[in-house]
């Protein structure tokens, strides 16, 4: 009985995603089944992404009526966050908005992108996109569409203060996989949980802090359990839009052009909005009583070097050639 029930559940999930999917035998519209790593109610990047899809949809309706439809299925409640790129690779979904750190099991070199100091269009000009396209084609059966979420940095947020770098030793802090090596070097005990569980972990003192970008704290509802933000920040949150490669290849040229140009516009829009967003959010932090802790200059310098060295050390062990090449490409000459 249990096996029958499990089979029904699996079949239901598959049918949920196959509903409205596009095959070569079907007529238009082509339906793009889409998921995101974060919910639209909690994450700034998801909200901006869905606004962008709406903009592209309107342009498609005007230029190519009846040819393209975006079907947003949801976030981690539909497919667990760290399984979404695997779902994309297999063709269960057609497009994902995700973070590079969520699929390093497939592509460990993607962590290098957290060290970029370029804008997405500078990366395109420098050959970064072309190299990422090659890697995603080969390793994830994916087409690299765009990089969103630029300009923000990760920070450590705490419920109790620190004064120097040694004070982090022994702390339990919620992190994403990318942050684990650095946190361990700081003496932190890293805890990995889904983003939706950070509030509960803080409220119940399972952790005394978490690592997140500035723009997402308030919308995730974390201000009530947050007292301190530590500077300097480290690593850019690398938010990407990927499409299943087989799906991409089947698209007619007019829709490929529409999507490519629309996503490039979205990159510029995101950069403009994130600067305003960060300024606004820092003001909201003050209103909520969140204090900023600036590490002493010597500690701050050590902190930044430890962060960069920890990340590159791991990447070069797992993917020496691609990791080194990617780092060279994102480093401004």
Residue ranges and their predicted role:
Residues 12-13, 43:
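Alpha-helical transmembrane segments and their juxtamembrane interfaces
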Residues 125-138:
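Signature of the catalytic double-stranded beta-helix
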């Amino acid at each position: 009985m249990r096996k029958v029930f499990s089979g029904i559940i699996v079949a239901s999930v598959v049918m949920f995603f196959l509903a409205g999917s596009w095959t070569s035998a079907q007529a238009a519209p082509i339906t793009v089944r889409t998921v995101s790593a974060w919910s639209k109610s909690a994450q700034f990047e998801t909200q901006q992404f869905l606004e962008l899809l709406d903009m592209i949809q309107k342009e498609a309706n005007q230029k190519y009526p009846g040819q393209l439809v975006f079907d947003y299925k949801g976030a981690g409640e539909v497919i667990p966050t760290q399984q979404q790129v695997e779902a994309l690779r297999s063709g269960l979904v057609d497009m994902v908005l995700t973070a590079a750190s969520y699929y390093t099991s497939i592509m460990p070199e993607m962590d290098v992108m957290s060290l970029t100091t370029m804008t997405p269009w500078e990366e395109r000009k420098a050959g970064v996109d072309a190299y990422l396209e090659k890697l995603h084609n080969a390793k994830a059966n994916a087409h690299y569409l765009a990089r969103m979420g630029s300009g923000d940095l990760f920070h450590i947020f705490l419920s109790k203060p620190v004064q120097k770098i040694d004070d982090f030793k022994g702390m339990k802090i919620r992190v994403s996989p990318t942050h684990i090596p650095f946190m361990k070097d700081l003496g932190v005990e890293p805890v990995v949980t889904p983003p939706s569980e950070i509030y509960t972990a803080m409220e119940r003192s399972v952790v005394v802090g978490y690592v997140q970008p500035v723009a997402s704290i308030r919308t995730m509802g974390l201000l009530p359990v947050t007292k301190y933000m530590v500077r300097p920040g480290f690593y850019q949150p690398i938010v990407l839009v990927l499409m299943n490669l087989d799906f991409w290849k089947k698209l007619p040229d007019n829709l490929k052009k529409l999507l490519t140009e629309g996503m490039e516009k979205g990159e510029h829009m995101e950069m403009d909005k994130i600067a305003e967003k960060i300024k606004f959010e820092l003001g909201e932090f003050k209103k909520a009583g969140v204090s900023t802790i600036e590490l002493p200059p010597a500690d701050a310098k050590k902190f930044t070097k430890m962060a960069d060295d920890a990340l590159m050390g791991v990447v070069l062990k797992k993917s020496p050639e691609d990791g080194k090449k990617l780092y060279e490409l994102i480093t401004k000459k």
